[in-house]
Amino acid sequence: MAKERIVLPSAEFKKNSNITLKDYKSLYKESIENPNKFWAKEANRLTWFKKWTKVLNHDFKNAKVEWFKGGKLNVSYNCLDRHISTPLKNKAALIWEGDNPSESKVLTYYDVYREVNRFANVLKKYGVKKGDRVLVYLPMIPELAITILACTRIGAIHSVVFGGFSPEALQSRIDDCKPKLIVTADGGFRGGKPIELKRNVDIALEKSKEDVKTVIVVRRTGNESGLVWKDGRDYWYHFLISDPDLSPYCKPESMDAEDPLFILYTSGSTGKPKGVLHTTGGYLLGVNLTFHYVFDIKPEDTYWCTADIGWVTGHSYLVYGPLSNGASSVMFEGVPSYPDAGRFWDVIDKYGVNIFYTAPTAIRALMREGLTHVQKRNLSSLRLLGSVGEPINPEAWEWYFKIIGKEKCPIVDTWWQTETGSIMITALPGAIPQKPGSATLPFFGVQPVLVDNDGKEINDKGEVSGNLCIKSPWPSMMRGVYGDSKRFFDTYFSQFKGYYFTGDGARRDKDGYYWITGRVDDVINVSGHRIGSAEVESALVENRSVAEAAVVGFPHDIKGQGIYAYVTVKEGIATNDTLKKELVAIVEKVIGKIARPDVIHWAPSLPKTRSGKIMRRILRKIASGEFEGLGDTSTLADPSVVQKLIEDKRKFHS
């Protein structure tokens, strides 16, 4: 392995940080040794209508967990009501930036409160009650945040479906969660192009076995040509919310801490969507506490998480974490490349963003564009950077740190999952020294362990690798797969008894820092040696010609598995044998000869989901010469990428 660099927080950041290293160590110790005491104290960060009867009740072996049972609270009350009787009433809650740079809007806490109350009453008027599901299929506009907060106000369970998903993907989610009502828009904009939404809902409902009686439509594009309207089912949002007879106040429903809050679907390996179910009290406490410490939030900060609310990052760190802390949260409808590759930097400059949280995929794409766009903008307001979604390779980390953060902004490289609800392993800026590429140390209450394939904990000192599991419950963890308790147990608790299995592999270094090596099915077993795909990818992108790389295993006659690398080069770089040799050499240098790629496949681009994750399942099949039965590809941003890779592979074979 290359020598690890340690980056210390600056003296100034350290001085003003929300937590010190000493406090982190003592609080972490308490959170593991006495979780009941620790979480009872931290739960006071929220406003409760009634105190719980017991902090924690669990049987991890049988996947049973309850936090704050009997405690009563309401999420929208914690995000809105408790702020509007304070000076936060007129503070910006949501700063909305449209796809087109000419469109923007600022909503104060009172603005959001007023709109949420009115829309909650609309939902009630159309028969939505506590426990009913509301499916939300909207672009990144303020009404999306307003809708989910209105659901929480009346105790309805929201299920947000990313606006880029197809009618088929939408239908499968409708069939699974059986919504009482759907909220959508006439359409949306993404990268200057219109996107279909209402039409997709119409198609999905036509094919669905569910009889959804009400569809509420937000006017976003104003383009009604081709819009099919079903009287008695379809209603305009703006007409309903501006009804003069609508009460301006909706009393927040008193919810048990364990009442369901939302369902969020993730891709399952079987192709059937997996509805991750989160509950009210533990989830809200998890996102509230992590937001405060991980992002070192201050009252005057402007914070921007670039994620879509269709993904868990948008739920936790665009809406619920920031608003429950009384922060100002930027909400962006567009893409980083429109109208040009300087758009992210424009938004930071325009709003004086202090904290910026984005994905390595975006960082690598912007890195590929060079410095021109960055140098034209003023990024001096930034004081903290974050990364989410996948491990960030050290080269991208260094670029982010030096070019965007000007070597003064710590980077929080956060590891967590849709299933965990909130950040699990991370640096705490100002307290914990960072190592580029490492997710760092566990957050309070999180007890990660590495286990071998027989389920035995690996407790050796020094550097070790294994399957990343969590040993004990944490408040924001998922409570089930919606409507399928067997699948919940089988997926997360059956492989290693008594542990929550994350599905990821990791190594722990001599300092206790965790390095995520990729999904366990992304671990390649070469001649009995376990090679993490993320490690090989990191080595490949150290070469200045490489923009991005994805590495998978494929059947090898001698080694069992060989290493197959898909490599995308930067603009203007020629692909040739000389570059191939350089790439093999750099992998040998950084990891060792055992990790040298057997095949380098030049890829103009990689197949990604709309949230930016590389679909490795498809890459593995292509590498193995399996071109049929690629499984569910409905989440792909650009299906033509797959076709091109298959054509290239066929040529390579012939």
UniProtKB/Swiss-Prot annotation:
Keywords: Acetylation, ATP-binding, Ligase, Magnesium, Metal-binding, Nucleotide-binding. Acetylated. Deacetylation by the SIR2-homolog deacetylase activates the enzyme. It is an enzyme of class 6 (ligase). Its EC number is 6.2.1.1. One of its GO terms (biological process) is acetyl-CoA biosynthetic process from acetate. Pfam families: ACAS_N, AMP-binding, AMP-binding_C. GO terms for molecular function: acetate-CoA ligase activity; AMP binding; ATP binding; metal ion binding. CDD domains: ACS. It catalyses: acetate + ATP + CoA = acetyl-CoA + AMP + diphosphate. Transmembrane segments: none annotated. ATP binds at G389, E390, P391, D413, T414, W415, W416, Q417, T418, D504, R519, R530. The keyword Nucleotide-binding applies. The modification N6-acetyllysine is found at K613. CoA binds at R190, G191, G192, K193, T313, S527. Coiled coil: none annotated. Mg(2+) binds at V541, V546. The keyword Nucleus does not apply. Its cofactor is Mg(2+). NCBIfam families: Ac_CoA_lig_AcsA, PRK00174.1. Belongs to the ATP-dependent AMP-binding enzyme family. Catalyzes the conversion of acetate into acetyl-CoA (AcCoA), an essential intermediate at the junction of anabolic and catabolic pathways. AcsA undergoes a two-step reaction. In the first half reaction, AcsA combines acetate with ATP to form acetyl-adenylate (AcAMP) intermediate. In the second half reaction, it can then transfer the acetyl group from AcAMP to the sulfhydryl group of CoA, forming the product AcCoA. This is Acetyl-coenzyme A synthetase. The lineage of its organism: Bacteria, Pseudomonadati, Spirochaetota, Spirochaetia, Leptospirales.
